[in-house]
Amino acid sequence: MADGSGGDDRPLIAVLDYGIGNLRSAQKALEHVGADARLTADKALIADAAGVVLPGVGAFGRCVEALGEAGLADVAHEAASVAADGTGRPVLGVCVGLQMLFDGSDENPEVPGLGVVPGRVHLLPEGVKRPQMQWNVLRWSGPTSMADGLEPDPWVYFVHSYWAQPDDPSYVAATCDYGIEVTAAVARGRMWATQFHPEKSAANGLRILENFVAETRAGVR
């Protein structure tokens, strides 16, 4: 389906299946907001999709390695890089999916990330509970279509011990307060990524996913 449609006006969204991540919950949440979401490692299907989701949970290094073992590292890098340029299809990274977009992580410093967002991932500081496993308030850094339809300062759900720090602060779409100002979301062009789990964030998370689906309906640029 080269038009990126699931066949019934629902945009086809490829959730990259490399054996690790919040796959089923992400798929169900996307379907709930009107997408035809497919868990897939099929490059032809991914190429036909109107949008791409890069999930991830667990250790940074293992996620990057598993993505490569599934033959999807180059696919994810190309899709996210093109999206960040404001062209191509929308891409959404979730949790470690956000972290993998960076150059690397202190969790596994020997493993390079995808290098789409210049910067590194760091351990949350001493003096705070690790992981952050709680609801927290998003503070938007500026206008973004990710926030369309949301009340100011929405609550979303986090589970993480590491946080991403872009070299260029303009990548930061939202932050949260957790002893320090933690990057909660990044955005550039048509590339979005969240440290929090939208699929676990009740109505606010579903709204963010709905906004992503709406972006996929705009087609390839």
Predicted regions and their residues:
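Conserved beta-strand elements of the Class I
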Residues: A14-L16, L92, Y157
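Acyltransferase
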Residues: T194-R221
